[in-house]
């Protein structure tokens, strides 16, 4: 009796893409750790929250009271509103986004992409004083740009059961701030290319801001996306899509130095009997020489409740072979959430509506 030849079992093709995805995610985690420890020179769009204090009258920050024995900080009643509004608009700038139609990539699919995004901000409002590029003693002299630009890269990996996982990072241009982003998508309905049925997907995403010690900012999003694909000339494929996104923004203050001109260690180490050494100190803290009074100048904005924003978006993906280009427009409604429990009274989100335009290009592998 002739022996039967056993056929080799084919290897599944999704192992290599998953290995590559794991490598990229690991790389993003390493990048995040490096950015969190980074102490690079601040640029014009980096946060500087002490600028939210009005010093235009030439008397220094009105929040600060310095005496020979102590330094105290008392925020003005509108300070928490300015902080909340700034976190709201910055949260929209770095909110999770991935410009894609509703269809997933399939369990063996993987996508690599790069994107550029410009998001409108209320640059003329006082809460945008809280960046490095604004001079607090003359805040109208230089203002932030009306549109903030972010650039980034993303990877998407298809999974079984109509699931898809994605990760990426974006940089706020002219700043040291980055946001690490990730999302999970589930396609409720997809693949009916020959029927007049649209694809429908739901998605949950998260974005964490790194590269600043002024604040921690976490943005969570839940999306609903609907799309329909069309073939063009048997070569191109066009997939228009529309969607709605609910954003939940959690912003918390870091430790802020209200007397940045005074170094607490230098002040404490200065002999008050040494007139030359005392004269070398900034005038505002000369009376505190030899004391630890300047340490009272560190403060935090009070914790606040979640900020909620709604965003509508639409775009189209144009694909040729493995190459694709996506254009998207988004509109986020003006903020209106309120936290009535802060120690200084209610903090209102006074952010304006924000438009955004994005372009993304890459490869479907």
Question: Where do the PLM segments sit?
Answer:
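Transmembrane beta-barrel domains of Gram-negative outer membranes and organellar outer membranes
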Residues: 42-192
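Predominantly the C-terminal beta-signal and adjacent terminal strand-loop region
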Residues: 43-52, 317-365
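Residues on the lipid-exposed face of transmembrane beta-strands in outer-membrane beta-barrel proteins
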Residues: 94-96, 100-101, 112-114, 153-159, ...
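Residues that define the transmembrane beta-barrel architecture of outer-membrane proteins
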Residues: 106-108, 146-151, 176-182, 216-222, ...
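Transmembrane beta-strands of outer-membrane beta-barrel pores
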Residues: 116-120, 169-175, 186-188, 204-210, ...
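Outer-membrane beta-barrel translocator domains and adjoining extracellular loop/strand segments
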Residues: 124-129, 177-182, 211-217, 251-261, ...
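Extracellular loop and loop/strand-boundary signature of outer-membrane beta-barrel proteins
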Residues: 138-141, 168-170, 208-213, 298-302, ...
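Outer-membrane beta-barrel translocator/channel fold
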Residues: 199-292, 296, 356
């Amino acid at each position: 009796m002739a022996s039967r030849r056993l056929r080799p079992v084919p290897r599944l093709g999704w192992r290599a893409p998953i290995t590559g995805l794991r490598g990229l995610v690991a790389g993003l985690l390493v990048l995040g750790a490096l950015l969190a420890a980074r102490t690079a020179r601040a640029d014009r769009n980096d946060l500087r929250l002490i600028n939210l204090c009005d010093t235009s009258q030439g008397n220094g920050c009105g929040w600060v009271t310095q005496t020979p024995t102590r330094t105290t900080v008392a925020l003005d009643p509108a300070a928490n509103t300015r902080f909340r509004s700034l976190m709201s608009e910055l949260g929209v700038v770095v909110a999770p986004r991935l410009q894609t139609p509703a269809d997933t990539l399939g369990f063996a699919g993987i996508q690599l992409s790069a994107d550029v995004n410009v998001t409108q901000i209320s640059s003329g409002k006082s809460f945008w004083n809280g960046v490095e590029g604004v001079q607090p003693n003359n805040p109208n002299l230089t203002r932030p740009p009306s549109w903030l630009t972010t650039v980034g890269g993303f990877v998407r990996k298809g999974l079984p059961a109509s699931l898809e996982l994605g990760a990426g990072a974006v940089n706020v241009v002219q700043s040291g701030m980055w946001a690490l982003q990730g999302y999970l998508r589930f396609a409720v309905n997809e693949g009916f290319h020959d029927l007049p049925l649209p694809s429908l997907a739901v998605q949950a995403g998260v974005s964490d801001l790194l590269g600043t010690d002024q604040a921690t900012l976490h943005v969570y999003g839940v999306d609903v996306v609907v799309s329909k694909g069309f073939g063009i000339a048997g070569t191109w494929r066009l997939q228009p899509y529309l969607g709605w996104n609910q954003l939940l923004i959690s912003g918390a203050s870091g430790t802020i130095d209200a007397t940045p001109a005074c170094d607490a260690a230098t002040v404490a180490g200065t002999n008050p009997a040494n007139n030359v050494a005392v004269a070398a100190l900034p005038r505002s803290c000369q009376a505190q020489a030899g004391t630890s009074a300047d340490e009272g100048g560190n403060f935090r904005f009070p914790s606040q409740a979640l900020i909620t924003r709604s965003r509508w978006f639409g775009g189209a993906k144009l694909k040729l072979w493995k190459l694709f280009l996506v254009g998207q427009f988004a509109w986020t409604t003006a903020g209106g959430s309120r936290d009535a429990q802060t120690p200084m009274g209610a903090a209102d989100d006074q952010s304006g509506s924000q438009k955004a335009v994005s372009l993304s290009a890459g490869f479907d592998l």
